[in-house]
UniProtKB/Swiss-Prot annotation:
This is Deferrochelatase. InterPro entries: Dimeric_a/b-barrel, Dyp_perox_C, Dyp_perox_N, Dyp_peroxidase, EfeB/EfeN, TAT_signal, TAT_signal_bac_arc. The keyword Membrane applies. Binds 1 heme b (iron(II)-protoporphyrin IX) group non-covalently. The gene is efeB. It comes from Bacillus subtilis (strain 168). Its cofactor is heme b. Catalyzes the peroxide-dependent oxidation of various industrial dyes contributing to their detoxification and thus can be used for the bioremediation of dye-contaminated wastewater.
């Protein structure tokens, strides 16, 4: 089908959305919590029949890299961004020391003390995951550009330590960004195979940040693979993440994800995290033909195979798929990133009455200017998928390397 033939149909789809839109007031949601007034107490794990099973669900916290990046993709995510309100770097150091202690405890399956001598103080632990396994819990921290510099002024004496590629992602033609759905001085990505375990971890981390940071946004996502480990599917029903390289290949991960040199010392073993909250127009998509859907992606919906091939993992032949398809444009750049996306649903959009759902796109790369942004520009300019999606949140974060026992996350940055 020619571009001239497609154009009226594309306008019609956009009009559907416009006709369905209604004026609505913006709703601001604030988050707050009670800080821990008593020191954190760790209890020894009691032997039980569940011990062996729980050990299999523990992702090590300490290491060269932070967990939650090349870790096997979990089912649930809570993704939060915070703005720092503290004026002194010492407060930030205290926060990251506390966060490290809590994260190490929770990811290893240990519990905070259930006993509390003073009943007139808030409980140390909110308690909702007390009887649950660690469920492959991981917590990943990152820093936004505003952590280092704000309104042209150095913050905490760390401007000289700002990573060289850390800046707000450039705005794209199809963006409709809400500043409260992107950005932030600090990000926290909490992943687990049990939603309640993930929520509990984030809730207690945010409680510890009261008085030091304000919550900017919190997103909840999910993504389930098949029974036999098949590639998960997004809300459009297509396989999501087929092009990812094996995270078990250290050489590949060093070439795509992990920073070894050329950045401030604290970024060694770290990476950059790109975040895009992408709204999907599900009602319009659901009324599109299977042919249009497959032409949009450049893959078969059922098998995930690229056009002209039989299997999902077969190589893409660019001359056999539409030039404006999502796969064609992503592959034509020759760039590689590590995708770690999740779907989200947030009820109904009060402005349109349609379902408020989409994709929490998260990717990791060692050089966003060379890897992610060229791909983003190519997709934003011509991607047929843009007819069915709109980005409403955007951010780029620098994730420090991991830490050893006795250290805390970002120590090389905060004590440099």
């Amino acid at each position: 089908m020619s571009d001239e033939q497609k154009k009226p149909e594309q306008i019609h789809r956009r009009d559907i959305l416009k006709w369905g839109a209604m004026a609505g007031a913006a709703v601001a949601i604030g988050a707050s919590g009670l800080g821990g007034l008593a020191p954190l107490v760790q209890t020894a794990a009691k032997p039980s029949k569940k011990d062996e099973k729980e050990e299999e669900q523990i992702v090590p916290f300490y290491g060269k890299h932070q967990a939650g990046i090349t870790t096997a993709h979990q089912t649930y995510v809570y993704f939060a961004a915070l703005d720092v309100t503290a004026k002194d770097k010492s407060d930030i150091i205290t926060l990251f020391r506390n966060w490290t202690s809590l994260t190490q405890m929770l990811t290893s399956g240990k519990k905070m003390s259930a006993e509390q001598r003073n009943q007139y103080l808030p409980p140390q632990d909110t308690g909702e995951s007390a009887d649950l396994s660690p469920s492959n819990l991981t917590v990943t921290f990152g820093f936004g550009p505003g952590f280092f510099e704000k309104d042209g002024k150095d913050r905490f004496g760390l401007k000289s330590k700002k990573p060289k590629h850390l800046a707000a992602l450039p705005a794209m033609p199809n963006d409709n960004l809400d500043e409260k759905q992107g950005g932030g001085d600090i990000c926290i990505q909490v992943c687990a195979d049990d939603e309640q375990v993930a929520f509990h971890a984030l809730r207690n981390l945010l409680n510890q940040a009261v008085g030091t940071c304000e919550v900017r946004f919190v997103n909840k996502g999910f993504l389930s693979g098949g029974k036999n480990g098949e590639t998960p599917r997004n809300l459009f029903g297509f396989k999501d993440g087929t092009g990812n390289q094996s995270t078990k290949d250290d050489t590949l991960m060093n070439s795509i994800v992990w920073i070894q040199s050329g950045e401030p010392d604290w970024m060694t073993g770290g990476t950059y995290m790109a975040f895009r909250k992408i709204k999907m127009f599900l009602e319009v998509w659901d009324r599109s033909s299977l042919k249009d859907q497959e032409d949009t992606f450049g893959r078969r919906k059922s098998s995930g195979a690229p056009f002209g091939q039989k299997k999902e993992t077969d190589p893409v032949k660019l001359n056999q798929i539409p030039s404006n398809s999502h796969v064609s444009l992503a592959k034509s750049t020759g760039k590689q990133i590590l995708r770690r996306a999740f779907s989200y649903t947030e009820g109904l959009d009060p402005k349109t009455g349609y379902m408020d759902a989409g994709l929490l796109f998260i990717s990791f790369q060692k050089n966003p200017d060379n890897q992610f942004i060229p791909m983003l520009k190519a997709l934003s300019a011509k991607d047929a998928l843009n007819e069915y999606t709109q980005t409403i949140g955007s951010a780029l974060y620098a994730c420090p390397g991991g830490c050893k026992k006795g250290e805390y996350i970002a120590q090389r940055l905060l004590e440099s």
